[in-house]
Structures are given as structure tokens and as C-alpha cells.
């Protein structure tokens, strides 16, 4: 899967109010789409989460992680960003008119 190294300082909070731990960013990466999986293994991993657990996953790679699949990391690209927020959409619109 494509990944980017973390540039920001990353904190863990157990309660959402105070910092519990400073995480070592040299071991943290931001995953990007699209990922590539062995279809049969990935399908089986997703089917194992049906019907109720599939809605609680944190991304399309999580079923593969939960199933113990080997997931190789490759260098991602800053220009490959997901449109999730209004700010992301504005960034995309700006790219279109350039």
C-alpha cells in the first residue's frame, strides 16, 4: 500500500481531553489509496467481518490486517490525496482551474 511518513508530531489521548502519550513518528505512516490486495484473500477477509463488524473498520486495509495478510508499504505521493473534507474539495477545485 502507498504510504507517506508522518511529518507532524502525533499524540495519543485515552480520553480525548488530555495527552496520554507522544507517539514515535518514525514508526508511523499515513496510508493512501488505492491499495492492491490478492482478491481471494481480501474477499475472504471482508466476508469474515459481515454482517456487523464491516461497518466499524477504519479503512480498506483493516480487513487485511485483521486477517493477518502481508501488507507491503511503497512510497506514496503527496499529490495523491483523498477528498474527505470541504477543504480537500476546495484544493481539488483549485487544481482543476490551474
Enumerate the predicted regions with their spans.
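Anionic-ligand binding region
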Residues: 1-30, 36
Amino acid at each position: 500500500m502507498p504510504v507517506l511518513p508522518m511529518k507532524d508530531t502525533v499524540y495519543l489521548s485515552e480520553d480525548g481531553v488530555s495527552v496520554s502519550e507522544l507517539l514515535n513518528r518514525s514508526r508511523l505512516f499515513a496510508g493512501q489509496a488505492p491499495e492492491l490486495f490478492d482478491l481471494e484473500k481480501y474477499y475472504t477477509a471482508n466476508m469474515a467481518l459481515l454482517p456487523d463488524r464491516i461497518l466499524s473498520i477504519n479503512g480498506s486495509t483493516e480487513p487485511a490486517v485483521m486477517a493477518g495478510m502481508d501488507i507491503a508499504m511503497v512510497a506514496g505521493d503527496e499529490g495523491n490525496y483523498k477528498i474527505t473534507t470541504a477543504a480537500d474539495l476546495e484544493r481539488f477545485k483549485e487544481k482543476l482551474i490551474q
